[in-house]
């Protein structure tokens, strides 16, 4: 029996194994490898000198094989996508046997399906199922969670959020054959009605919120000087994950309202009934942001309705097994600034600025760290997890791991998270600040 089982031998699986093998707490946990290709498994064993690490050969399309293998671990890190095609057998086995699960999916249609299929059963077996534990969507979820804590520490536990906006800068973003296959599978394999049903902002939330802010051609970060502008984000799942976290916290607070022992703790995690969230990709100029928004929308529509466009994309995008080099992975970065404003109709709102800075290529190197630390939250900090996690279910990174994951990410050596109150919300040049976290 191992604590963590890494499923998959592609570029992300390799990076997760590399990270776990050199982890600062390596002596406190055990891990194993699982994959379909014996030669790739042997290659990883040889590359990282993992002679004492258990290895399992498994085909994720074979439910019986998956069922047998997952019983040898406490937490499964699943790096095998597209998850719409290959993920259900793994989650089904985990839920049935009370095992825990994290992955790196960016497929909202699949997340919506697994919530409907597995959430209730997971609460009965105590299985913690947390999809979306990579650069999609941990930074977005973390930023709002931390901003909410900063707000309540400054303005009191009854303070609520009106609007939260994140401005993303992704430097040196890589692309592998597996990610390309997952993207194209969303257009070719998923029924159209599933894609439509998984597009609303609150489609993953157990609670319906107020209407979110309307999409725009060009976005501007509030209280930024000079103005930080950008285009629509292609990572729509980020908003949906943030709203599921909001909904799970709202629902938990409502259920615990009459319990004096848990009511205050639950309320502290809520963002407020009028919470709205949006994000965008930063561009140097208004024109570049506008053109990116137009091209993203044209490209998405073309890929969704034109088979010739998907065939062309398949020829141009990386093939299975292809991916960025180790040298390339070290050159990337993610820099995100979030501005959150409180709901305060009688006076000036409180404004919080929170930043998330990651050193390394975001989609693979940083994602492998995020998903590995998510798994270790369960193994090494299980008693410290939020009450929602202890009940099991299909959760989000912040509803399942909360402060535990925030602190683990800050300790990994590549990620910095800071949050501060802007003292003068009326001035766009917000240099006068007070640090609170």
Show the residue positions of the predicted features.
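Rossmann-fold NAD(P)-binding glycine/threonine-rich loop
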Residues: 105-127
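ADP-ribose/adenylate-binding Rossmann-like module
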Residues: 82, 93-111
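Conserved beta-strand positions in the Rossmann-like core of class I SAM-dependent methyltransferases
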Residues: 29-32
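N-terminal Rossmann-fold cofactor-binding loop
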Residues: 34-38, 59-60
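N-terminal Rossmann NAD(P)H-binding glycine-rich loop of SDR-like oxidoreductase domains
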Residues: 3-23
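C-terminal catalytic/substrate-binding lobe primarily of soluble NAD(P)-dependent oxidoreductases
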Residues: 13, 126, 149-437
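Conserved Rossmann-fold cofactor-binding substructure of NAD(P)-dependent oxidoreductases
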Residues: 57-73, 79-85
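Short, conserved SAM-binding/catalytic segment
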Residues: 44-51
């Amino acid at each position: 029996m191992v604590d963590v089982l890494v499923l998959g031998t592609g570029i992300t699986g390799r990076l997760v194994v590399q990270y776990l093998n050199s982890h600062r707490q390596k002596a406190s946990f055990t891990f194993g490898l699982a994959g379909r290709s014996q030669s790739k498994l042997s290659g990883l064993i040889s590359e990282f000198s993992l002679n004492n690490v258990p290895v399992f050969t498994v085909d994720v399309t074979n439910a019986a094989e998956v069922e047998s293998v997952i019983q040898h671990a406490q937490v499964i890190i699943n790096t095998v996508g597209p998850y719409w095609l290959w993920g259900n057998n793994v989650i089904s086995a985990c839920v049935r046997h009370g095992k825990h699960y994290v992955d790196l999916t960016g497929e909202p249609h699949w997340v919506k399906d697994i919530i409907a299929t597995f959430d209730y059963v997971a609460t009965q077996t105590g299985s913690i199922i947390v999809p979306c534990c990579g650069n999609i969507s941990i930074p977005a979820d973390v930023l709002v969670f931390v901003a909410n804590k900063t707000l309540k520490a400054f303005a009191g536990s009854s303070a609520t959020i009106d609007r939260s906006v994140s401005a993303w800068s992704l430097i040196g973003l890589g692309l592998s054959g597996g990610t390309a296959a997952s993207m194209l599978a969303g257009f070719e394999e998923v029924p159209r009605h599933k894609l439509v049903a998984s597009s609303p902002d609150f489609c993953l939330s157990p609670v319906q919120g107020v209407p979110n802010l309307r999409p725009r051609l060009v976005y501007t970060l509030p209280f930024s000087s000079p103005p930080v502008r950008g285009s629509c984000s292609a990572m729509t799942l980020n908003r949906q994950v943030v709203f599921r976290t909001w909904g799970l916290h709202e629902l938990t607070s409502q259920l615990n309202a009459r319990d004096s022992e848990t009511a205050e703790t639950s309320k502290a995690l809520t963002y407020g009934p009028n919470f709205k969230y949006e994000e965008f990709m930063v561009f140097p100029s208004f024109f570049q942001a506008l053109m990116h928004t137009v091209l993203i929308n044209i490209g998405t529509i073309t890929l969704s309705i034109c088979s010739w466009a998907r065939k062309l994309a398949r020829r141009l995008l990386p093939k299975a097994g292809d991916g960025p080099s180790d040298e390339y992975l070290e050159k990337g970065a993610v820099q995100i600034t979030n501005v959150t404003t409180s709901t305060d109709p009688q006076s000036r709102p409180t404004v919080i600025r929170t930043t998330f800075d990651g050193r390394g290529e975001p989609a693979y190197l940083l994602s492998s760290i995020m998903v590995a630390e998510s798994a270790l939250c369960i193994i090494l900090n299980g008693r410290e997890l939020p009450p929602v996690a202890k009940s099991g279910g299909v959760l989000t990174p912040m509803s399942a791991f909360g402060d535990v994951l925030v602190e683990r990410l800050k300790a990994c050596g590549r990620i910095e998270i800071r949050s501060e109150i802007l003292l003068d919300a009326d001035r766009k040049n917000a240099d006068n600040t007070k640090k609170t976290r």
